[in-house]
Amino acid sequence: MKNVLPPFIEIYRALIATPSISATEESLDQSNASLITLLAGWFSDLGFNVEVQPVPGTRNKFNMLASTGHGAGGLLLTGHTDTVPFDDGRWTRDPFTLTEHDNKLYGLGTADMKGFFAFILDALRDVDVTKLKKPLYILATADEETSMAGARYFSETTALRPDCAIIGEPTSLQPIRAHKGHISNVVRVLGQSGHSSDPARGVNAIELMHDAIGHIMQLRDSLKTRYHYEAFTVPYPTLNLGHIHGGDASNRICACCELHMDIRPLPGMTLNDLNGLLNDALAPVSERWPGRLTVAELHPPIPGYECPPDHQLVEVVEKLLGTKTDVVNYCTEAPFMQTLCPTLVLGPGSINQAHQPDEYLETRFIKPTRELITQVVHHFCWH
């Protein structure tokens, strides 16, 4: 099988050279179809059955599932095909040209996280996948950097139930078994415009929002004292006020005001619970000013995630790597994969390079990542 695929570095180079930017702004958003076609071809060459799945509600985005083997269980290796947009003025290299310098591989997606697929392909090039005793699945998803639509759709529609899954996000090969969720909301206040010389003839939306923010701050303090998870560096749910806008002139009573905020819940906290807490916090304002305050989602929510610490996957990976699993504050697709099977987040490269100009992956990760993928495939698909 070894001559079927291009060399590792050429696979990497081709992945980086194929743009697949996800953005909420339509002018920046790109289809991942070309990248999916590349991956589908390579996994087909290795003997996998390949299914390409359009993702509803996206701008021409696709998931790809490559599978081999029969029966129940097995292993799912998964990652996203998209990258964030890049700031051309801050990059000193071409983001779409893989450049090796000073023991680093530079390019958009080298760490986050197109490179993971190059590692999978390279680790499997000498494996006769038709002889695996349990199924092996490779999932490439769309739109992780914006809506996570690909992972959401796959988890809602697939009948697959592997024994376990590994998401190859850049964790510096530190296995992650839990992370916080993310909920982003917009609070809107509708006032009544009027001339500032007669405040009684209007309803000032900024003043109502000031009242609302006071209640939101009380909720923030309550979250900090009521919920605790010691393993996290920030061991409580955080609440952040990120953006506010209201009014258009100093001599006009403000007619509308809008606040963008987010909450990062701990694993185990349900999205319904958090929505209820926010609505309860704002209830005094809503009752005093009926019909003038609304709360809506800015983006689809992401629940917190946790893999049981005593699961076989945790035990096996900790033994292979000689290190304990950890928890992180950022989000991945793990909550959606966890609905299918126990899931770890584990991959080459540093999260500190994600979304940064001159993104890179250190070459010191190449050998241990290849070895790790080989070992987990052997353990979960050969035994």
Curated annotation (Swiss-Prot):
Assembly behavior: Homodimer.
The name this protein goes by in its record: Acetylornithine deacetylase
GO cellular component terms, semicolon-separated: cytoplasm
Encoding gene (name): argE
Cofactor(s) listed: Zn(2+); Co(2+); glutathione
Cofactor binding description: Binds 2 Zn(2+) or Co(2+) ions per subunit.
UniProt-annotated binding residues for Zn(2+) 1: 80, 112, 169
Segments forming a coiled coil: none
Catalytic activity annotation: N(2)-acetyl-L-ornithine + H2O = L-ornithine + acetate
EC number of the protein: 3.5.1.16
One GO MF term attached to the UniProt entry: zinc ion binding
Function as written in the Swiss-Prot or TrEMBL entry: Catalyzes the hydrolysis of the amide bond of N(2)-acetylated L-amino acids. Cleaves the acetyl group from N-acetyl-L-ornithine to form L-ornithine, an intermediate in L-arginine biosynthesis pathway, and a branchpoint in the synthesis of polyamines.
